[in-house]
Amino acid sequence: MAAARCLRWGLSRAEAWLLPPPTSCCHRALHRQVEGTEFRSAYSLDKLYPESRGADTAWRVPGDAKQGNDDIPVDRLTISYCRSSGPGGQNVNKVNSKAEVRFHLASADWIAEPVRQKMALTHKNKINRAGELILTSEYSRYQFRNLADCLQKIRDMIAEASQPATEPSKEDAALQKLRIENMNRERLRKKRINSAIKTSRRVGTD
């Protein structure tokens, strides 16, 4: 009995040394499956905007046609993050949650030329000396939400600039003319009042 027990114990020890543990086999198989791949977060740009890679999927319209409804090519943008301003405690002081998106407007061929020209005139205060249109967002505590807000601002700008200019009706033109006349009349009235006040001060000193 003792000899058989010793034999069984020796065989079990040999199997333990010769056979790899099942977890290592699983790890090796998993490593072979993911070898050559790259980990991407659920909030990576490729997963948040899967249809926005390259200029082929971007806004490109012939002539003066209306701008399309496709997404923005994220790989054509320069995206950075920095500290937010305003209240927020330690989260504001330690986390780079503010998103900044910029791109060169004149060379953005994924936007139609007439739309780019109109955007350059309408939003000239957002364009730096290098010709880059800069947008920022810090309304949220999270980077990906602020980035999404910046992209939505670009969409709104493109949609606004894509609207064709409409001629005002006769009623609107007459109303606009009346408003301008009233503004000029009020401006001249205030100017006369200020002139009378200055004249009265000079008379009082004499």
Curated annotation (Swiss-Prot):
The modified positions for N5-methylglutamine read Q90
Keyword hit for Ribosomal protein = yes
Give GO terms for biological process.
Answer: mitochondrial translational termination; rescue of stalled ribosome
Q: Which domain of life is it from?
A: Eukaryota
What residue range does the UniProt record give for the transit peptide?
Answer: 1-29
Q: Which GO terms describe its cellular component?
A: mitochondrial inner membrane; mitochondrial large ribosomal subunit; mitochondrion
Single GO molecular function: peptidyl-tRNA hydrolase activity
Where is the protein localized? Mitochondrion
What EC number(s) is this enzyme filed under? Answer: 3.1.1.29
Q: Report whether Translocase shows up as a keyword of the record.
A: no
Q: Mainly resides where?
A: mitochondrion
Mod. after translation: Methylation of glutamine in the GGQ triplet by HEMK1.
Which top EC class applies here?
hydrolase
Q: Which UniProt keywords apply?
A: Hydrolase, Methylation, Mitochondrion, Protein biosynthesis, Ribonucleoprotein, Ribosomal protein, Transit peptide
- Its function? Essential peptidyl-tRNA hydrolase component of the mitochondrial large ribosomal subunit. Acts as a codon-independent translation release factor that has lost all stop codon specificity and directs the termination of translation in mitochondrion, possibly in case of abortive elongation. May be involved in the hydrolysis of peptidyl-tRNAs that have been prematurely terminated and thus in the recycling of stalled mitochondrial ribosomes.
- Subunit composition and interactions: Component of the mitochondrial ribosome large subunit (39S) which comprises a 16S rRNA and about 50 distinct proteins.
Protein name per the record: Large ribosomal subunit protein mL62
UniProt lists the gene as MRPL58
